[in-house]
């Protein structure tokens, strides 16, 4: 284990990922019933048909912002794994304090 640092057996060094699936159009995985359930939890009774695509768009932007900030915290700490605390700090930075995940 000489000169390999924390990795042990040289894990994650060299070589491209062979079977990396291209991620696109995953926002459609947020289904109509899932959006409906979220709206019900928020006290909504009837939902317009145009709401679903709009909700997907807003959710995508929100998640992009949170993930970008979380990854920034991770990179600053020189880690490769995003922790729950990175997400908590990212949400706090955006004015959405989240309790119950440490810190």
Curated annotation (Swiss-Prot):
<feature type="modified residue" description="N6-acetyllysine">
    <location>
        <position position="6"/>
    </location>
</feature>
<dbReference type="InterPro" id="IPR019809">
    <property type="entry name" value="Histone_H4_CS"/>
</dbReference>
<keyword id="KW-0158">Chromosome</keyword>
<keyword id="KW-0539">Nucleus</keyword>
<comment type="similarity">
    <text>Belongs to the histone H4 family.</text>
</comment>
<feature type="modified residue" description="N6-acetyllysine">
    <location>
        <position position="13"/>
    </location>
</feature>
<dbReference type="GO" id="GO:0030527">
    <property type="term" value="F:structural constituent of chromatin"/>
</dbReference>
<keyword id="KW-0007">Acetylation</keyword>
<feature type="modified residue" description="N6-acetyllysine">
    <location>
        <position position="21"/>
    </location>
</feature>
<dbReference type="GO" id="GO:0000786">
    <property type="term" value="C:nucleosome"/>
</dbReference>
<keyword id="KW-0544">Nucleosome core</keyword>
<dbReference type="InterPro" id="IPR001951">
    <property type="entry name" value="Histone_H4"/>
</dbReference>
<protein>
    <recommendedName>
        <fullName>Histone H4</fullName>
    </recommendedName>
</protein>
<feature type="modified residue" description="N6-acetyllysine">
    <location>
        <position position="9"/>
    </location>
</feature>
<feature type="region of interest" description="Disordered">
    <location>
        <begin position="1"/>
        <end position="20"/>
    </location>
</feature>
<feature type="DNA-binding region">
    <location>
        <begin position="17"/>
        <end position="21"/>
    </location>
</feature>
<feature type="compositionally biased region" description="Gly residues">
    <location>
        <begin position="1"/>
        <end position="14"/>
    </location>
</feature>
<feature type="modified residue" description="N6-acetyllysine">
    <location>
        <position position="17"/>
    </location>
</feature>
<dbReference type="Pfam" id="PF15511">
    <property type="entry name" value="CENP-T_C"/>
</dbReference>
<dbReference type="InterPro" id="IPR009072">
    <property type="entry name" value="Histone-fold"/>
</dbReference>
<comment type="subunit">
    <text>The nucleosome is a histone octamer containing two molecules each of H2A, H2B, H3 and H4 assembled in one H3-H4 heterotetramer and two H2A-H2B heterodimers. The octamer wraps approximately 147 bp of DNA.</text>
</comment>
<comment type="function">
    <text>Core component of nucleosome. Nucleosomes wrap and compact DNA into chromatin, limiting DNA accessibility to the cellular machineries which require DNA as a template. Histones thereby play a central role in transcription regulation, DNA repair, DNA replication and chromosomal stability. DNA accessibility is regulated via a complex set of post-translational modifications of histones, also called histone code, and nucleosome remodeling.</text>
</comment>
<feature type="modified residue" description="N-acetylserine">
    <location>
        <position position="2"/>
    </location>
</feature>
<dbReference type="InterPro" id="IPR035425">
    <property type="entry name" value="CENP-T/H4_C"/>
</dbReference>
<dbReference type="GO" id="GO:0046982">
    <property type="term" value="F:protein heterodimerization activity"/>
</dbReference>
<dbReference type="GO" id="GO:0006334">
    <property type="term" value="P:nucleosome assembly"/>
</dbReference>
<dbReference type="GO" id="GO:0005634">
    <property type="term" value="C:nucleus"/>
</dbReference>
<keyword id="KW-0238">DNA-binding</keyword>
<dbReference type="GO" id="GO:0003677">
    <property type="term" value="F:DNA binding"/>
</dbReference>
